[in-house]
Protein backbone atom coordinates (compact mmCIF):
# COMPACT_ATOMS: atom_id res chain seq x y z
CA UNK A 1 0.00 0.00 0.00
CA UNK A 2 1.11 3.53 -0.74
CA UNK A 3 1.55 6.08 2.01
CA UNK A 4 -0.55 9.21 2.17
CA UNK A 5 2.59 11.18 1.32
CA UNK A 6 3.12 9.09 -1.82
CA UNK A 7 -0.44 9.76 -2.97
CA UNK A 8 -0.62 13.46 -2.11
CA UNK A 9 2.84 14.99 -2.57
CA UNK A 10 2.85 16.99 -5.84
CA UNK A 11 -0.71 15.85 -6.63
CA UNK A 12 -2.65 18.09 -9.02
CA UNK A 13 -5.33 18.89 -6.43
CA UNK A 14 -2.79 20.17 -3.90
CA UNK A 15 -0.51 23.21 -3.66
CA UNK A 16 3.20 23.76 -3.13
CA UNK A 17 2.32 24.91 0.40
CA UNK A 18 0.53 21.59 1.02
CA UNK A 19 3.56 19.71 -0.29
CA UNK A 20 6.02 21.49 1.99
CA UNK A 21 3.72 21.04 4.96
CA UNK A 22 3.58 17.29 4.20
CA UNK A 23 7.39 17.12 4.19
CA UNK A 24 7.44 19.01 7.49
CA UNK A 25 5.03 16.45 8.97
CA UNK A 26 7.35 13.62 7.85
CA UNK A 27 10.27 15.32 9.56
CA UNK A 28 8.20 15.73 12.72
CA UNK A 29 7.41 12.00 12.61
CA UNK A 30 11.15 11.31 12.33
CA UNK A 31 11.84 13.42 15.38
CA UNK A 32 9.21 11.52 17.37
CA UNK A 33 10.18 8.02 16.25
CA UNK A 34 13.94 8.06 15.62
CA UNK A 35 15.91 8.24 18.84
CA UNK A 36 18.36 11.16 18.90
CA UNK A 37 17.17 12.47 15.53
CA UNK A 38 18.88 15.78 16.26
CA UNK A 39 22.30 14.10 16.29
CA UNK A 40 22.17 12.82 12.72
CA UNK A 41 24.23 14.73 10.17
CA UNK A 42 21.63 15.70 7.56
CA UNK A 43 23.24 18.64 5.76
CA UNK A 44 21.28 18.69 2.52
CA UNK A 45 18.36 17.49 0.43
CA UNK A 46 20.04 14.24 -0.61
CA UNK A 47 20.89 13.24 2.98
CA UNK A 48 17.43 14.15 4.32
CA UNK A 49 15.66 12.38 1.46
CA UNK A 50 17.83 9.29 1.95
CA UNK A 51 16.95 9.30 5.65
CA UNK A 52 13.24 9.61 4.78
CA UNK A 53 13.59 6.76 2.27
CA UNK A 54 14.77 4.34 4.95
CA UNK A 55 18.47 5.07 5.53
CA UNK A 56 17.83 5.50 9.25
CA UNK A 57 18.34 3.27 12.31
CA UNK A 58 14.74 2.02 12.24
CA UNK A 59 14.77 1.49 8.45
CA UNK A 60 11.45 3.30 8.19
CA UNK A 61 10.73 4.56 4.68
CA UNK A 62 8.43 7.55 4.83
CA UNK A 63 9.08 8.16 1.13
CA UNK A 64 8.89 5.11 -1.12
CA UNK A 65 11.94 4.26 -3.26
CA UNK A 66 9.96 4.73 -6.47
CA UNK A 67 8.39 8.09 -5.65
CA UNK A 68 8.27 10.17 -8.83
CA UNK A 69 9.37 13.33 -7.00
CA UNK A 70 12.82 11.96 -6.19
CA UNK A 71 15.45 12.47 -8.89
CA UNK A 72 18.35 10.17 -9.83
CA UNK A 73 20.62 12.03 -7.40
CA UNK A 74 18.23 11.09 -4.58
CA UNK A 75 16.91 14.63 -4.07
CA UNK A 76 13.29 15.43 -3.31
CA UNK A 77 11.89 17.70 -6.03
CA UNK A 78 9.13 20.26 -5.76
CA UNK A 79 6.19 20.11 -8.15
CA UNK A 80 8.16 22.23 -10.64
CA UNK A 81 10.98 19.68 -10.80
CA UNK A 82 13.46 21.71 -8.74
CA UNK A 83 15.23 20.20 -5.70
CA UNK A 84 13.67 21.35 -2.44
CA UNK A 85 15.98 23.31 -0.14
CA UNK A 86 16.28 22.21 3.50
CA UNK A 87 17.79 24.53 6.10
CA UNK A 88 18.31 23.10 9.56
CA UNK A 89 17.72 26.06 11.83
CA UNK A 90 18.15 24.13 15.08
CA UNK A 91 18.29 20.56 16.32
CA UNK A 92 14.52 20.26 15.94
CA UNK A 93 13.56 22.86 13.34
CA UNK A 94 14.06 22.50 9.58
CA UNK A 95 12.93 25.17 7.13
CA UNK A 96 11.79 23.85 3.75
CA UNK A 97 11.87 25.97 0.57
CA UNK A 98 10.49 25.51 -2.95
CA UNK A 99 11.75 27.62 -5.84
CA UNK A 100 8.21 28.59 -6.81
CA UNK A 101 6.76 29.06 -10.27
CA UNK A 102 9.82 30.84 -11.69
CA UNK A 103 11.87 27.70 -10.88
CA UNK A 104 14.70 29.85 -9.49
CA UNK A 105 15.66 29.48 -5.84
CA UNK A 106 15.98 32.53 -3.58
CA UNK A 107 13.60 34.83 -5.49
CA UNK A 108 10.44 36.57 -4.30
CA UNK A 109 8.07 33.79 -5.38
CA UNK A 110 9.76 31.06 -3.32
CA UNK A 111 7.45 29.15 -1.01
CA UNK A 112 8.84 28.58 2.49
CA UNK A 113 7.52 26.35 5.27
CA UNK A 114 7.13 27.30 7.97
CA UNK A 115 6.60 30.84 6.78
CA UNK A 116 6.13 33.91 8.96
CA UNK A 117 2.33 33.57 8.85
CA UNK A 118 2.53 29.99 10.07
CA UNK A 119 4.92 30.98 12.84
CA UNK A 120 2.74 33.90 13.99
CA UNK A 121 -0.32 31.60 14.20
CA UNK A 122 1.65 29.26 16.45
CA UNK A 123 2.57 32.03 18.90
Regions found by a protein language model. Give the residues of each.
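Amphipathic alpha-helical segments typified by the pilin-like N-terminal helix
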Residues: 1-18
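Low-complexity, acidic interaction segments enriched in glycine
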Residues: 14, 18-123
